[in-house]
UniProtKB/Swiss-Prot annotation:
Glycans are attached at residues 90, 301. Residues 1-21 form the signal peptide. Coiled coil: none annotated. The lineage of its organism: Eukaryota, Metazoa, Chordata, Craniata, Vertebrata. It is linked to Tetraamelia syndrome 1: A form of tetraamelia, a rare disease characterized by rudimentary appendages or complete absence of all four limbs, and other anomalies such as craniofacial, nervous system, pulmonary, skeletal and urogenital defects. TETAMS1 patients manifest complete limb agenesis without defects of scapulae or clavicles. Other features include bilateral cleft lip/palate, diaphragmatic defect with bilobar right lung, renal and adrenal agenesis, pelvic hypoplasia, and urogenital defects. TETAMS1 transmission pattern is consistent with autosomal recessive inheritance. This is Proto-oncogene Wnt-3. It is found in: Secreted, Extracellular space, Extracellular matrix; Secreted. It comes from Homo sapiens (Human). A lipid is attached at residue 212 (O-palmitoleoyl serine).
């Protein structure tokens, strides 16, 4: 590991106690192999870090769906890393820390808004898919979509019960967001925005039946989209996220913080929009305080004028170029019937990395 990254990582780990105070550290279950077999080891609920009492009760009462919860968080993290692969902050995780994103999510930034939304959406998605696959006895197919068929098709297969997946995500992910402060309000809003995206993208999926693929009759069921579509949608919401301001109100239970759109001339955010109220760091240089790893040695696109281009990604520091040889399949030929044969070629590429 590069010395500057090693020093940063040590800073993040040693400063972890400060980070954990308001952090959903139960996300770390996505990185633990032990949680894939929760159904056969009920005592592991107590070993999941960061669970509040309500989450612990949920885990023990619905132990068989906890592997899906873990899989959903993992799915959300992977999608975050895909969506931000060309950004200065690329959704880096720290395997040896309970705060798996480091201090980055300590602030109420756009990045924090996106991660909460995609993680909550991931939990809803994975639980819904698991139920449709029959891996749990407490859920199954959606029984609501069995009404009159449409023209040329009939109901069949297993419609995915996204309402149940959303309910699980809401009960589990929102359990810790019960404080009367602005950060809890922000997290709950963005969690719900992620889950709403799942419901909004449900669609009919059909299979044709008939002689020679004539599709005389179609069997259809209610299905979730590919999770990539959810990530793409939420990434657009990240780019257009609404900046908020914090307001304090005196209520019977004490002071309560709420959020209000900062700019009254703009359309106020809906339940489908992401919200934030603190500015992001520029992520150009390593900084243990903000959790930034910097962009040194990151691969950049020399032909792009976007954020993944060498000018912006490297923050004006310039870039290095090296050549790299790669083995690739080439001159492929299709043989009847039915296989493809290829030769192996060596191709040379220019690789550009930030200084």
């Amino acid at each position: 590991m590069e010395p500057h990254l090693l020093g940063l990582l040590l800073g993040l780990l040693l400063g972890g106690t400060r980070v954990l105070a308001g952090y959903p550290i139960w996300w770390s279950l996505a990185l633990g192999q032990q949680y894939t077999s929760l159904g056969s080891q009920p005592l592991l609920c107590g070993s999941i870090p960061g669970l509040v009492p309500k989450q612990l009760r949920f885990c023990r009462n619905y132990i068989e769906i906890m592997p899906s919860v873990a899989e959903g968080v993992k799915l959300g993290i992977q999608e975050c890393q895909h969506q931000f692969r060309g950004r200065r902050w690329n959704c880096t995780t720290i395997d040896d820390s309970l705060a798996i994103f480091g201090p980055v999510l300590d602030k109420a930034t756009r990045e924090s808004a996106f991660v909460h939304a995609i993680a909550s959406a991931g939990v809803a998605f994975a639980v819904t898919r698991s139920c449709a696959e029959g891996t749990s006895t407490i859920c199954g197919c959606d029984s609501h979509h069995k009404g009159p068929p449409g023209e040329g098709w009939k109901w069949g297969g297993c419609s995915e019960d996204a309402d149940f997946g959303v309910l699980v995500s809401r009960e589990f992910a929102d359990a810790r967001e019960n404080r009367p402060d602005a950060r809890s309000a922000m997290n709950k809003h963005n969690n719900e925005a992620g889950r709403t995206t799942i419901l909004d993208h449900m669609h009919l999926k059909c299979k044709c039946h008939g002689l020679s693929g004539s599709c005389e009759v179609k069997t259809c069921w209610w299905a979730q989209p590919d999770f990539r579509a959810i990530g793409d949608f939420l990434k657009d919401k990240y780019d257009s996220a609404s900046e908020m301001v914090v307001e304090k109100h005196r209520e019977s239970r004490g002071w309560v913080e709420t959020l209000r759109a900062k700019y009254s001339l703009f359309k106020p955010p809906t339940e489908r929009d992401l919200v934030y109220y603190e500015n992001s760091p520029n992520f150009c240089e390593p900084n243990p305080e903000t959790g930034s790893f910097g962009t040194r040695d990151r691969t950049c696109n020399v032909t792009s004028h976007g954020i993944d281009g060498c000018d912006l990604l490297c923050c004006g520091r310039g870039h290095n170029t090296r050549t790299e040889k790669r083995k690739e399949k080439c001159h492929c030929i299709f043989h009847w019937c039915c296989y493809v044969s290829c030769q192996e070629c060596i191709r040379i590429y220019d690789v550009h990395t930030c200084k």
